[in-house]
Amino acid sequence: KKLNKEEWFKRIEGLYHKYNIQLKKFYHILSEVDVYSSGAKLSIQNGYYRPELKEADKSFIECKEIRHPIVEKIHTETEFITNDIELGVQNKKDGVLLFGTNACGKSTFMKSIGLNLIMAQAGLFVAAKEFIYKPYTQIFTRILNNDNIFRSQSSFAVEIQELKSILKRADNNSLVLGDELCSG
């Protein structure tokens, strides 16, 4: 017997309802396989490094030759400058005040740290030569310069309010990334 369109939809709907739980489990497993196989392919193609987890009293990052995984692919006409960073490592600095002339890579470096940390904590390889860390429980960013015209707040007032909120919630296991603070 040849089925018409409506009968096909009813059969498919019936199968979906019958195997709904199994299908959801299958889709979940398939999505994880997709994420990790894509991550593995990118890692091989781009020379990414397997991050190392290390036990410590508080969160930290110690990395060599960190790169921005997106910028290095977009700007292929120039050599990407790598950087080293240690944050929260025992007897070392818990923070860095990064300054320099315009367009020298400060924002890219800061975003490189955040992106690579998120990649590491998601179980992916990272754009660095070495990456040792204890996971952070919170990552706060203050990157965009925004005013709030609905509340009649200047960019500076919004920045101060956001910084206050970040500082209230941050602890030893938080990473705070801020770009061009108090420039409004």
What annotation goes with each model-predicted range?
Residues Q138-G184:
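Switch/coupling sub-region of P-loop NTPases
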